[in-house]
Amino acid sequence: MSETPLHWQTITTLSQQIHRGTLSPVALMEHLLDRAEALDGTLHAFRLIPRDRALAAAQAAELTLRAGQDAGPLHGIPFAVKDIIDVNGLPTTAGSHLLQDNVVSANATVVERLLQAGMVLLGKAQTVQFAFGAPGINHHHGTPHNPWHATPHVPGGSSSGSGVSVAAGMVPMALGTDTGGSVRIPAALCGTVGLKTTVGQVSRAGVFPLSWTLDSVGPLTRSVQDAALVYQAMRGPDPADPSTHNASFQDVLSGFTDGVRGLRLSVAESVFWEETDPDIVSAVLRCGDVLTTLGAHVDSLAFLEADEALAAASFGLIGAAEAYVDHLERLGERFDEYDPIVSTRMLRAKDATPMDYLRAIRAHNALCHKAQRTLRDVDALLAPTTMIPSLPVSEVDSSLEVYHQWNSRYSRNTRVANMLGLCALTVPCGLTSHGLPIGLMIMGKASDEAMVLRVGHAFEQATDWHHRTPDLSWAE
């Protein structure tokens, strides 16, 4: 069997070679930079790639390792960040021309922690404008091209470039943010792993906000083990983010390989399955069979059935209202300069009253508590990450009304975890009859990232879906 090319390897295997001295961080960075620059004219995954800076960082990582200063398993590993996350000396545009000159002077906390762990930045990935859209479309900076189809298909959003950059082998990890599915949707549609962290586990300081109630930061990777390594490095309290002050933090690597024998895993019923693509239904149900074979007790659970309408309405109001207020403070009344697919959603909150917002927040808090009670005796929930696979951009973006319909469909399943305060992981679990990726969503209790990562790793070890890669001969 031929050796796996560097660009398809996981952080774990790359790290082993770097620490053995058989792979130079500089050689790895050069390989990935060359690949990104060769493909990105077609795929549009990146907002910017500062090549000289990336190579200098890789050289520094190599020199410190030679000097015996080993920062750990992430030392010398390239990564990308969604362009709403601050990187010192680079612009954070949030996918909008209105912020094209917004060069920042400090790193976001998550970036600083990954740099301290030895990682090296390759570039900033494209995003939906202001991180507000599930299909991944951006009319101002360009829509990243899902690498699994030669005809333009949606990558999922809003961490669109993050999903494409990992799926196309440009970087082994990219940071995204998740307010209603923005890590998990592109991960599922592009065939990667994506972790939605519990609010308070990972600092959001230095991240352009969408919703201070619902925003979270998480990695997109090639394997669950990689996601665990990155999460372990970036989680923890931060004085600059009050949401982290009262959180408890697990060692997610302890027990990571314990498997699922004896665990109760419940297939979430009700809304998660309505009008879902038949290929997705079949693939996700087969996941239950795999986990049963591994020793888990797999059953079904009526989840959210009576509260789905309340959760959806409250989620929509919280997200739109908090975004609207924040944008008024930052950019003023310039909504006519926004992409209509974004401004029309924000402006829905213009006529909302303080009482409407407070009711939505109260519903959010009540649903979070109810979810924790419901899941008291359940280790994790299983569901399709999305109800539909990636579709042609021309179909999703044919009109503003049609776009909003597809936007709601893409986020229908994922937004549940955000509204209920859960953590969630998506892992590749199949391909449709058209060869497009399918994601299994594993949801866990608040701050129980260790469990969803453990279940995801066990599933991944028993299957080979995370090893599947797109044929990119049409893009090279």
Where are these regions (language model features)?
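Short helix-loop capping/hinge segments that flank enzyme active sites or metal/cofactor-binding pockets
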Residues: 74-94, 259-268, 317-372, 384-388, ...
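Short glycine/serine-rich loop segments
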Residues: 106-237, 418-439
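Acyltransferase
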Residues: 22-30, 59, 278-302, 328-333, ...
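Acidic/His- and Gly-rich active-site-bordering loop/insert found
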Residues: 54-56, 64-141
